[in-house]
Each structure stands twice: as C-alpha cells, then as structure tokens.
Amino acid sequence: MKVRKPHDAPRVIALDIETAPCVAYVWRTGKQAISIDQIQQESTIISFSWAEWEFGKVKKASYASTFDQEDQRDDSKLVAQLHTLLKDATHIVAHNGAAFDWPMINGAFFRCGLEPLPKPRILDTMLMARQIGGQASYKLAWLTQGQKTAKRSHSRFPGLSLWTEWLKRNPAAEQEMRLYNNADVEAMCELLDKVLPWAHGPQFAGLVPQSQGREEEAHHCPRCGSANVVARGFTTTVAGRYQRYRCSDCGGWSQSRFLVREKRRHLLKTI
C-alpha cells in the first residue's frame, strides 16, 4: 500500500549546476581588475543535474543542458526549466550552494525576466562539514572518498578543457559533463546522510512536516524525519530542563522545545 505524504511534506532537491566561463579581453595573465567594457560574454548556466533527496536513499540524477541548442550560451530555456523545478522546493542540497549555486540560479532567474521564487533553505554540505571541522579539505572530492557514490573526476578532459571542448560541441565532452554532473548530485546525497547527524542550524526547519507530529502524537527527528527516537538524558539551560533525544536511524541528537515539567507534546529542534 502506497504511503501518502503529509500535505506539508518537504520537497528537497539535490542540485548541481555547471556554467560557461565569462569571456573578456585581457592584456596579460595574473591578478588584475577587469572592467565591464572588457567583458564579451557573461557566464551562463549550461547544464544542471538534480535528484529528490530522501534520507537513506540515493536516487538516480536527471540531467539537462544547452548542448544541442544553436546558441549554447542562451540559457533562457534551461533557466525556465530550473524555475519550474524549484518553484515548490522547500530545501536545496548543494555543495558550496549558499555561496555559488543558489546566487547563480537566483541571478539567472532575474536576468531571464522570471518571477522571484520564495528562497528555499540551503542544505550546504560544505558548510555542514565545516561545522564538524578537522578535515584536510572540504572539497566534495575529498569528503566523498570511500563512499559508494563518490565525486567523479573528469580526467578525460582535465581542467578547463572539459568546458572548452563542450563549447566546441564535442559529443564526448557532453557525455563526460553528464556523468560528471550526475555523479556530483548522487555523491552529495550520500554525503548529506553522513553529515546530517553532526550539523545544526535553521536550515533544517521544515524537513519534518508539522502535521506529522500533531497527528501521530510522536517525536520525530528534526533532521531525517524518523519517529524512531529514544529519550536519552536531559539538556539543562537557565530556563529549565528539557528532554533530550537520539535518533536511532541517523544518529542525530535533538531536544524538546518545552520544559520537562510541562505536560505538553514535545516539538524537537537541533542542538
């Protein structure tokens, strides 16, 4: 029997975009300031991959690009696809997504004359890993080592050559871009499952439907949504004592928002 999702269930989209480089006239290499009259072509989105994230499941990613268009740098149709995809998204999963992917996507919506979308919460796997700390590198390639799905290197077209060959309409470069883009999304989904129990912050708000806790009279993990939580000790603050819980599925810790002495249902928040 198919389980019906709550009416306020989150829609979490794992996403990775690739952009064409900006083209400008320059006189030398090295650090320099480039004025707007030197720019010949601005950076545009040339491809993206995405998958719906669900804790404990790595779903196959889907891919879209401008490769077969007459003008590969005209991203208006691709951006419109992104706009449709994200209009109902409550959360976006992206590595360095807060600093790069979302600003580029939102800027593309503006540039293409589309309506603004309500900003989704960004589940940035790079920022979550930085919260944990102590890693030699926070690049996706490093953090996903040893995973079932790891970040793919584009060694067939190393460095910038993947993008330059893609723009030359090399079909092998398009195949490599598809594999590279899709692997990033699938690797991010697996990485999110690993860092989720360790991370904390307001980005988790809405991952668990509010109606779920009210209807079932049960505690739910605010990270993965599991009802399989166990009361483990208490958290004490100047305001009083709160019940603490550990999720038996993802391993994350959470606490009640209400004092222990109050006989009210518990709503959980990350700590």
Q: Can you annotate each of these PLM segments?
A:
Residues 56-147:
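Conserved DEDDh/DEDDy metal-dependent 3′-5′ exonuclease domain
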Residues 221-224, 247-250:
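Short cysteine-rich clusters marking metal-coordination/redox-active sites
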Residues 225-229, 254:
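Cys/His-rich microdomains that often coordinate metals
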Residues 233-244:
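Short linker/helix segments within small regulatory modules
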